[in-house]
């Protein structure tokens, strides 16, 4: 299971689709609708959020925005904040649209989860995930590797490369991350 901290526009097709499926699974786990994956380390940051289901819904919403921009068909009806989907989607000064800066990314859409509090992600985690993504893309989609470089250049600093739900903070790789050498 990989729920990327990186902005969805940086993910190649396989990573975007897999992330969508795995985050839908995360939503099921948090709702108590499945017995599997309940202790998966990728769930830690969502469980720590004051509104975990709303955070997952905000995350999924941005994945769906990127899918729409690419002409993919992700079923938004599968996104739900919980038993009362019509309820509040969070509060606070932070917004799940904070990192909306790149013309190559699907950031401009209205987000119904914009008031969900951001999740901190250490810069070291982003660096690791970007290196991991580059490694994966180099082996499976060299054409995307070129697009990835262009999109990274357009975003500028690495802190602008986070998924809009995440706020980049100083720090190393998350303790829950199972790192690989590549």
Predicted segments with their positions:
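Short beta-strand
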Residues: 35-37
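Sequence termini and other peripheral, non-core segments
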Residues: 1-16, 22-25, 29-33, 47-88, ...
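Conserved, mostly hydrophobic/aromatic
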Residues: 40
């Amino acid at each position: 299971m990989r729920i990327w901290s990186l902005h969805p526009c940086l993910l190649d097709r396989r990573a975007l689709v897999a992330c969508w499926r795995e985050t839908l699974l995360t939503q099921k786990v948090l709702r108590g609708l499945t017995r599997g994956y309940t202790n998966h380390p990728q769930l830690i940051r969502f469980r720590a959020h004051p509104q975990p289901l709303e955070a997952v819904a905000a995350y999924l919403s941005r994945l769906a925005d990127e899918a729409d921009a690419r002409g993919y068909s992700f079923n938004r009806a599968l996104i739900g904040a919980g038993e009362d989907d019509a309820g509040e989607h969070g509060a606070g000064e932070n917004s799940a649209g904070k990192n909306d800066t790149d013309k190559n990314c699907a950031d401009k859409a209205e987000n119904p989860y914009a008031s969900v509090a951001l999740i901190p992600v250490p810069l070291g985690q982003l660096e690791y995930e970007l290196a991991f993504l580059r490694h994966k893309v180099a082996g499976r989609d060299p054409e995307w590797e070129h697009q990835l470089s262009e999109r990274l250049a357009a975003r500028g600093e690495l802190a602008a490369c986070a998924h809009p739900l995440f706020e980049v903070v100083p720090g190393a790789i998350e303790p829950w991350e199972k790192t690989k050498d590549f």
